[in-house]
Regions:
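A glycine-rich dinucleotide-binding beta-alpha-beta segment and adjacent secondary-structure elements
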Residues: 305-371, 400-413, 538-592, 597
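Internal hydrophobic alpha-helix adjacent to the cofactor/substrate pocket in enzyme cavities
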Residues: 377-400
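An anion/pyrophosphate-binding glycine-rich loop and adjacent beta-alpha core
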Residues: 38, 54, 182-319, 417-500, ...
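Short hydrophobic core segments
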Residues: 10, 143-154
């Protein structure tokens, strides 16, 4: 049988779901192919969304019209804003979610999108004609044809799972691996390699002595992931904190000979920033304890996730070690932790739309590009889905985000310019324009662009316009309203900050670290009048305005730096040079430029091994 579509998406994980939703919402006739329709959007590891830098990616995905933020808000059982003790450039939202409800909310969301079909099957072969992807053949013998193909297969491509010395093919616990699909891509010259990840044991809550652990409740303020204001619907639950000890470590060390990480079974590279418990012991032998966070898997389940205890040790060693922790002395488990090795493709062979440079019409997103994390996958999936749909339109429009526009832009630029030799995880430190990429202003950066593309809907765009207008009004009031010392000094003295010696504007007061719009509103009539007019989401608008006031100088300074770099971004160099013939450029520079074939001079400047003098040579050759 044969079926025709505009876009086919392979894999129903976080990248695939966002890709399929984006393409279909833009009007492309789309088919999502997944092994199990009942596990769409499955959180394969921890039941949480967001975190440092990851939360910003979710906010950006939401601002672009993606679904992850909405679904997270609807299924959250705990919310926290991380890094709140630091500046707003690094504030990062994070939520625990109900794993089962998260899956069904994704299914409900996809089922409601016109133009989107879901097909339960397994991709077996990428169909290619004249270096252009034209379709997919499945293990059931079905042929699906399309103008654009998005591959977002997660850990399923030649997945191999490890528990102690036991190993078996699988893409996830009790799910099959995809055996031949990688080869149908790599045979066209796309480099394939292996990576490893892992997950911890799941524990029965009824067997845990929670009263012997430190409870960690969530927060109840106004912050959310979606700018659309989805109310929290589920019962909010705490997490718990405890620590490993010497007895735990001794037990784990006794089993290292059977650990696939240390007995030679696993040869691929795992995530540096999410190491297994056995890796922690080997890397930090002098540490007497490591923190463990017990996280609920859902509102109505006893299954608990033990964050910090990822392991592929034999099951009996895992259980014996866990029971050496006082709170887990009677622990019962649902399933062991395990490691999994899987295929990924060299992301330097993609352009910034995530389309392959070798096979036209083939887009890759998520862990198949060497990243780790639901959020990184979702951001890539959204970009791939948008560009897959644009390609079907027959025009030359491309959706690409710069490094000063989004963390997603930073992520994709890092992947395509630098490549990966270990699973890539986003951090705020990877972004050079952090003050421009805050979690509070992703809508300001991205929503209008997404609306014009057709991926963000009118209600989202209208809300952004309303929010923008109210922020502007508050800033005008603050910039233009004078304050007399007699009106404000009693309040300033009461909170322990210096009184005014002369009059000033409200903006000058808010610039002080101790003062806020919310705190000044009851005292200053002009501020109270404008904030009382806010129709909804008052706290969100006030916070956004306050951040713009307090960090105005930093924002303007960073924008100047970013604009200077834009000049290099605008200098297109792809296809203009035979780098091997440019002897003025260093040998390493010629090799890297030839391999990556950067699109712009700015991208070339970020390639490891390309020196500033190499860039100057290119500038001279371009007559700049």
């Amino acid at each position: 049988m044969k079926f025709n579509y505009d876009v086919i998406v392979i894999g129903g994980g976080h990248a695939g779901c966002e890709a399929a939703a984006a393409a279909a919402n833009m009007g492309a006739k789309t088919c999502l192919v997944t092994i199990d329709m009942n596990k769409i959007g499955q959180m394969s590891c921890n039941p949480a969304i967001g975190g440092i830098a990851k939360g910003q990616i979710v906010r950006e995905t939401d601002a672009l019209g993606g679904q992850m933020g909405l679904i997270t808000d609807a299924t959250a059982i705990q919310f926290r804003m991380l890094n709140k003790g630091k500046g707003p450039a690094v504030w990062s939202p994070r939520a625990q979610c109900d794993r089962g409800k998260y899956i069904w909310k994704w299914r409900e969301t996809l089922d409601a999108i016109p133009n989107l079909d879901i097909w339960q099957d397994q991709a077996d072969e990428l169909l290619v004609s004249d270096h252009e992807a034209i379709g997919v053949k499945t293990v059931w013998g079905i042929s699906l044809y399309a103008k654009s193909i998005v591959v977002s297969a997660g850990t399923f491509l030649n997945g191999l799972m490890h528990i102690g010395r036991h190993q078996y093919p699988g893409g996830r616990c009790a799910e099959p691996a995809v055996a031949h699909f990688s080869e149908s891509i790599s045979k066209w010259g796309i480099s394939v390699a292996r990576m490893k990840t892992g997950t911890p044991v799941r524990i029965d809550k009824r067997s845990i002595h929670l009263d012997e652990m430190e409870e960690q409740p969530g927060e109840t303020d106004f912050h959310q992931f979606s700018y659309m204001g989805t109310p929290r619907q589920l019962r909010q639950l705490p997490c718990w904190l405890c620590y490993t000890n010497k007895d735990v470590h001794d037990t784990l060390r006794s089993g290292l000979a059977d650990s696939p990480l240390y007995n030679g079974q696993i040869k691929s590279t795992g995530p540096r920033y999410c190491p297994s418990i056995e890796t922690k012991l080997v890397t930090f032998p002098d540490k007497d304890q490591h923190p463990l966070f017990l996280e609920p898997e859902g509102e109505n389940t006893n299954e608990m996730y033990l964050n910090g205890f990822s392991s592929s040790m034999p099951m009996e060693i895992q259980l014996e070690a866990i029971r050496k922790i006082p709170a887990f002395r009677d622990a019962k488990t649902y399933r062991p932790g395990y490691a999994i090795e899987y295929d990924y493709f060299a992301p330097t062979l993609l352009d910034h739309t995530l389309e392959s440079k070798i096979i036209r019409g083939l887009f890759l997103a998520g862990q198949v590009n060497g990243t780790t994390g639901y959020e990184e996958a979702a951001g890539q999936g959204l970009v791939a889905g948008i560009n897959a749909a644009l390609r079907c339109g027959g025009g030359n429009e491309r959706f690409v985000m710069n490094r000063d526009e989004s963390y997603i832009g930073v992520l994709i630029d890092d992947l395509t310019s630098k490549g990966v030799d270990e699973p890539y995880r986003m951090f705020t430190s990877r972004a050079e324009y952090r003050i421009l990429l805050r979690q509070d202003d992703a809508d300001a950066r991205l929503t209008e662009k997404a609306y014009r593309l057709g991926v963000a809907k009118r209600d989202r765009y209208d809300w952004w316009l309303q929010k923008k207008e109210w922020i502007h009004r508050i800033l005008q009031v603050c910039d233009n309203t004078p304050v007399k010392p007699a009106d404000i000094n009693p309040y300033l003295e009461n909170i322990g900050t210096a009184p005014l010696r002369m009059g000033c504007k409200i903006t000058d007061l808010i610039g002080r670290p101790q003062l806020s719009i919310q705190g000044l509103t009851p005292i200053l009539p002009a501020l109270r009048e404008i904030t009382d007019q806010l129709p909804n989401r008052k706290e969100e608008i006030m916070e956004a305005a306050e951040i713009q006031i307090k960090y105005k100088g930093y924002i303007e300074r960073e924008r100047i730096v970013a604009d200077k770099m834009h000049r290099l971004e605008n200098i297109k160099i792809k296809g203009r040079f035979d780098y091997n013939s440019l002897k003025e450029i260093s040998t390493e520079g010629r090799q890297k430029l030839t391999k990556i074939n950067p699109e712009t001079l700015a991208q070339a400047s970020r390639i490891p091994g390309v020196s500033p003098s190499d860039i100057n040579v290119l500038l001279v050759l371009l007559g700049r």
